[in-house]
Amino acid sequence: MRVVAFAPALSAAEQNGGGVNAKGFPMTSCFVDNFPAQITVPMVIALCALGGADYDPVKYIVATSPEGERVGSLEFSWHWHDNPPTPVKFRVFTQYLPMRVSAAGVYSIGLYDSLHQADTEYLYPLPVLKTNPLLANR
């Protein structure tokens, strides 16, 4: 299985006919009114695989604070049928990651095969900042 895209969006929704409708993708920063805050981050994940494999994948999205503390996670899985006669299959998801942000900083959001996996090549840095009230009406 190969990850084609993994990033947050300002908003994202799966379409009935397949695909995702996303705005603000990729999201390059997140603003909150106050700390601490509980936020939900729409994540877009696109994958492909060869037919004949990866029928019931399970993935985990984990958010960590700038200090490395886990501040949110979710598990998602699906049954992935082959698409004959095409030798490859594609899937795109929108997952909504709940996370607690306690202070401004760069949070990390990673895609993992297990909740206990230490490292991943799919890691997205997300700066979380406090909203500047002087710029709120711009």
Q: How does the language model describe each region?
A:
Residues 2-104, 108-138:
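Contiguous segments within soluble domain cores/interaction surfaces
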